Curated annotation (Swiss-Prot):
Organism whose genome encodes this protein: Arabidopsis thaliana
Function text: Probable transcription factor involved in plant development.
Sequence ranges assigned to domain GRAS in this UniProt record: 95-477
Known tissue expression: Expressed in seedlings, roots, leaves and flowers.
Database matches in PANTHER family: OSJNBA0084A10.13 PROTEIN-RELATED (PTHR31636)
Sequence segments annotated as region (SAW): 403-477
Name used for this protein in its record: Scarecrow-like protein 26
Localization per record: Nucleus
Length: 483
């Protein structure tokens, strides 16, 4: 990324950036920061959206401007946000939060570009990150400052991880499991982000197995298994006769995720078994340990007459990182089981491999800015619970995503097109029911008005915050399955 040298130093070392001085930085397209009329009292994510628009002044001269995702229009010039792109617009009396917020976005993008761009420089990256750490902390008073702190920490971890001199010094933040679960539960109460996928997938499963006596769910990444308690309760409530439906869950774990992951899957099984016993749900649980990321149906215990359901939650908060090759191996093998239903839930982050790391970084910043805005609408930044969730949960979540988007372009490209992959590899879409759509909308009614749900074709639903898509759920079956 090319910054005029003197202007970048002013941006970097100043404790109060004058927008008029910063406006001297002009792109090769003739746009300058003076063209941006920004009201930081409104949603700060719109600054990122303005950078991602065709008029953005942040991209390298030789690269294409980052396009808007999902064919969304009007984001950069929304009258409701006070942000517009026009020639000759002058800044009024600068506000501290406005100047600092804009400067933080510049520095974050500069750090990302310096860490992976054509002119990659570890020393420049280190210096920019050191400056960012001076400017922000996770306990700051604005959304932008706190979000910048989490991205700064995530970029710092990447820098440490890639260090040739001292790779052993890199350590991930480790929090007590009870704190992590508490933070996760708080997030569920603050936002529909997680429960949206759980709810829509569970409803689709209930509908698909309505007349089946034995149900076998193969769960790609079970985590704490919180999704299945509600499914058990629903099965019990409708099983009024003597022949109750039997539920069996097979949870996968991988040696590549370490002993802690294996132990967590086993503990999840104990909790689910105890819960099933307490409500009278016939239940069995198997733990399938994989030595590698490759999956084979021969490792499963299959029972004649069971309706097989494949549950695939990808890269949601608290879910382990799995490579595209691991997901492809799982879904390819799962197809041979002729599953009654495949549920696929994933975050709507634009990860087109051919766009490069900087594009992916900007889109990730865009994604989390929308998440922070949605949290602010439901729980003030001054609330201690909000800080707890950010520290224990959201910070590691940001860091994990930054790790994913640094993968090579060919690998990253797979993340963006799972529905397309399913449709071209022997799976057929299953239509979302009217009941499922209504339940999703009912869930959103419990939260702030900024959340929305839209249909994704005939077989999917998308959770969004204002103009930004956050999470999608889609439903499939093997082409050989008779519905």
């Amino acid at each position: 990324m090319n910054y005029p040298y003197e202007d970048f130093l002013d941006l970097f070392f100043s404790t109060h950036t004058d927008p008029l001085a910063t406006a001297a930085s002009t792109s090769s397209n003739g746009y300058s920061l003076n063209d941006l009329d920004i009201d930081w009292d409104c949603d700060f994510r719109d600054v990122i959206e303005s950078i991602m628009g065709d008029e953005g002044a942040m991209m390298e001269p030789e690269s294409e401007a980052v396009p808007m995702l999902h064919d969304q229009e009007g984001l950069c010039n929304s009258a409701s946000t006070g942000l517009s792109v026009a020639d000759g617009v002058s800044f009024g009396e600068p506000k501290t939060d406005e100047s600092k917020g804009l400067r933080l976005v510049h520095l974050l993008v500069a750090a990302a570009d310096a860490s992976t761009g054509a002119n990659k420089s570890r020393e420049l990256t280190r210096v920019i990150l050191a400056r960012l750490k001076d400017l922000v902390s996770p306990g700051d008073r604005t959304n932008m400052e706190r979000l910048a702190a989490h991205f700064t920490n995530g970029l710092s971890k990447l820098l440490e991880r890639d260090s040739v001199l001292c790779p052993q010094q890199h350590r991930d933040d480790v929090y007590d499991q009870a704190d992590v679960i508490s933070a996760f539960e708080l997030l569920q109460n603050m936002s529909p982000y997680v429960n949206f996928g759980y709810l829509t997938a569970t409803q689709a499963i209930l509908e698909a197995v309505k007349y089946e006596r034995r149900i076998h769910i193969v769960d790609y990444d079970i985590n704490e298994g919180v999704q299945w308690a509600s499914l058990m309760q629903a099965l019990v409530s409708r099983n009024t006769g003597p022949s109750a439906q039997h539920l069996r869950i097979t949870a996968l774990s991988r040696a590549t995720n370490g002993k802690k992951s294996v132990a967590a899957v086993q503990e999840t099984g104990r909790r689910l078994t105890a819960f099933a016993d307490s409500i009278g749900q016939p239940f069995s649980y198997q733990h399938c340990k994989l030595d590698t990321n490759a999956f084979s149906t021969s490792s499963l215990k299959l029972v004649r007459g069971e309706a097989v359901v494949i549950n695939c939650m990808l890269h949601l908060p608290r879910f382990s990182h799995q490579t595209p090759s691991s997901v492809i191996s799982f879904l390819s093998e799962a197809k041979t089981l002729n599953p009654k239903l495949v549920t696929l839930v994933h975050e709507e982050v634009g990860l087109m491999g051919n766009q490069g790391f900087l594009y992916r970084f900007m889109d990730l910043l865009h994604q989390f800015s929308a998440i922070f805005d949605s949290l602010e609408a439901g729980l003030s930044i001054a609330n201690p619970a909000r800080g707890f969730v950010e520290r224990v949960f959201i910070g590691p979540w940001v860091a994990n995503w930054l790790t994913r988007i640094t993968a090579n372009d060919a690998e990253v490209e797979s993340f963006a097109s799972w529905p397309q992959w399913l449709e071209t590899n022997g799976f057929k879409p299953l239509e979302v029911s009217f009941t499922n759509r209504c339940q999703a909308k009912l869930l959103l009614s419990l939260f702030n008005d900024g959340f929305r749900v839209e249909e994704l074709g005939q077989n999917g639903l998308v959770l969004g915050w204002k103009s930004r898509r956050l999470v999608s759920a889609s439903f499939w079956a093997s082409c050989q399955t008779n519905q």
